[in-house]
Amino acid sequence: MISNVLKRASVLARSNGIQSAFYTTTAKTEASSSPQMKIKTAEKKDHFVNFQVYRYNEETTAKPYIQTYNINLKDCGPMVLDALLLIKNNIDPTLSFRRSCREGICGSCAMNLNGSNTLACTKKITDCLSGDTVKVYPLPHMHVVRDLIPDLSHFYTQHKSIKPWLEPAVDVPRYNGKEILQSKENRHKLDGLYECILCACCSTSCPSYWWSEGGDGGYLGPAVLLQAYRWIADSRDSIQKDRLAILSEDQMKVYKCHTIMNCTAVCPKGLNPGKSIANIKYLLAHN
């Protein structure tokens, strides 16, 4: 019955000189494909920018140096990572840096751009220009493997020390193919925590972390402490006391935070590690 009604409506529309949506769409498509109907797009203008890039290779040079590349923004995409890829692919294949997702998810391309830590894949070139120059450095106060690649080994060791995984209660079946459920309220407590991508922008912008001693002790830094609180706050976890005990073994792991808040200022995901550290301090004082 419905199909008959549609057919009658179509016949009536044509008899009244009204085109159906199909014919209208077809006509528009044919018109747009016509050479006379093509829309002219504005051509990109030349815009040259100097990229001053930190270079270091312990195999070929004893000291780091700055190398300048003159790039026409007309030839690359809008992000700093686009310019670095242009340099590597077309100008200097020896330039080394990390990159992967190109959409602010993996954290691989974290670096220091004009004095501020951020992700090269989400930072527009025009947003970090100083005159006609962009200064590109590796994350500060880290050993440099090569060029823009920092050594994050110690950072990952610290992250491992907080047991960054879920430890459910013993009586919760682990391998029955079902989720460990939690209420909406408890799930909401993880907002602003689980989004951390461990890019290390916050930790390497923190003076307290710069002054921290290496090895197993010392200040854990904002990124690792935010991750620590992420698991402490998870209602599905059963070892909150153990996690707090790990953090209280050495007071400097947490209390070396002096609320400078560089961490919150530079986080490319808009998170607040300083708040997480304050919450940990509160729990340590009341447990």
UniProtKB/Swiss-Prot annotation:
Chain segments annotated as transmembrane: none
BP term (GO), one: aerobic respiration
Any one Gene Ontology cellular component term annotated for this protein: mitochondrial inner membrane
E.C. designation(s): 1.3.5.1
Cofactor(s) this protein requires: [2Fe-2S] cluster; [3Fe-4S] cluster; [4Fe-4S] cluster
Catalysed transformations (reactions): a quinone + succinate = fumarate + a quinol
Xref: Pfam families: Fer2_3 (PF13085), Fer4_8 (PF13183)
Name under which the protein is recorded: Succinate dehydrogenase [ubiquinone] iron-sulfur subunit, mitochondrial
Source species: Dictyostelium discoideum
The gene coding this protein: sdhB
